[in-house]
Amino acid sequence: MPDNTIRSNSDVVLIGAGIMSATLGVILKELQPDIKIEIYERLDVAAAESSDAWNNAGTGHSAFCELNYTPEKADGSVDPKKAISIAEAFEVSRQFWSYLVQQNKVPSPENFIKSVPHMSFVWGEKNVKYLQTRFEALQKNPLFSEMLFSTDFEQLKQWMPLVMEGREPDEKLAATTMAIGTDVNFGALTRSMFNYLEKLDGVSLYFNHEVRKLKQLENKSWRIKITDLGSGEKRKAYTKFVFIGAGGGSLPLLEKANVPEGDGYGGFPVSGQWLKCTNPEVIAKHQAKVYGKASVGAPPMSVPHIDTRVIDGEKALLFGPFAGFSTRFLKNGSYLDLPLSIKANNLIPMLSAGYNNIPLTKYLIEQVRQSPKDRIKALREYLPTARSKDWVLEKAGQRVQVIKKGENGGGVLEFGTEVINTQDGTLAVLLGASPGASTAVSIMVDLIGRCFKEQINTPEWEAKLKNMIPSYKQTLNDKPELLEQIRKQTAEVLKLNRN
């Protein structure tokens, strides 16, 4: 029988057409214009899973308002470290996106980024005290110097009129606001980046193509077996470097790669739902991302928010996310994803993480059992005047939280984003969930540093990275003048007004 397998050779293969692969592809092509890149995506369009606007839990994560990034310590103080690192990373993303706009590599910034204030909102004496402590810990840092805090009823009404409707002046309430917050449509941004990439010499983008097998050859290069889901045609792609950026699909692919660095990793899938507002009058009354505090015992990804989004030019309002449990790793995945991901090398970490996270299990069971009435009740904590007829339930994306081997051999459930790379730098994979997309540029620059060690230190690559990201190799949280200059410049290019 004739072998009809199509064979190809490249320098880089990107698996998954989401924000991470788009970012890595564009940066590598800028650094080395003659680099040959192949991109494989199992769906028929880019950014249809985790990067899509309706699937993305928190767009524009910059740690201005997400309280899970500033945990309260036992002594009542607040640790600002994680919030500072995320805010720093978001500034890097803003610089890179500005570069893309200035160079006409992506169309007008209005397509993917808008000014939307970021607010934190709490009630009850203990939470008000926490928010004030958080404000004091963050506001002295240049990244957060524009943050405002208030407990004044009239002031809060000005900041978030819809949230304050139906409340009494004697309620114990507090909020912070950051006027420079943004809403980012990562689906639109990702598709624009792939549209640009696809037109370049040496870039091939394949939709409806599923990666079935990965094998490292003796010469350290990789052979990837791929099936065209439309025609059934088989392909073999040979490449020097593989990046797996397939969202929830990354873990099964890491397992197929059979590298020692992947041992002990597991994944815990969490599905999501939103309440979406259908009343244009209500949508028009709210212009902010208002984040609350997760209830006691709930995991950090459960932080509720009432969120203004601009999706495909239309203003939208959503509340959530409500979590659920599904054994799928992707919205378009299989119910066998979780059971098939359990292997001998990750069984103990998986069981141990389950045993050590009883509150998470309890929380998910409660969420799954919620009735429409329960969801509206949760919404009314944020919008007391909400009417159930103005809201519908929408399915959001799948998140796969990382489980990794702890020091004692047991499992630790991680709530962040994790990059794993092989020692020889020929394969890298991104696992995990938030902050994800917002910090994609920092994550990919770090990945390039790990996997292209020789090239990244050449004067040529360094100069190009500095051109794309003016603050490259510098921190902004301790350089107020540089931060102000960069924020001003990126706000201008990205058309972020302060209305």
Can you annotate each of these PLM segments?
Residues 244-259:
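Flavin (primarily FAD) binding-site architecture
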Residues 29-53:
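Glycine-rich FAD pyrophosphate-binding loop
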Residues 108-121, 158-201, 359-363, 425-432:
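Helix-loop-beta segment of a Rossmann-like dinucleotide-binding subdomain
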Residues 173-241, 438-452:
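Helical element adjacent to the flavin cofactor pocket in flavoenzyme catalytic cores
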Residues 171-180, 188, 325-457:
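C-terminal catalytic lobe of FAD-dependent flavoproteins
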Residues 10-38:
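N-terminal Rossmann-like FAD-binding beta1-loop-alpha1 element of flavoenzymes
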Residues 58-158, 316, 328, 334-337:
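Dinucleotide-binding Rossmann-like beta1-alpha1 core, especially the glycine-rich loop
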Residues 81-94, 122-129, 176-198, 206, ...:
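Short beta-strand to alpha-helix junction loop
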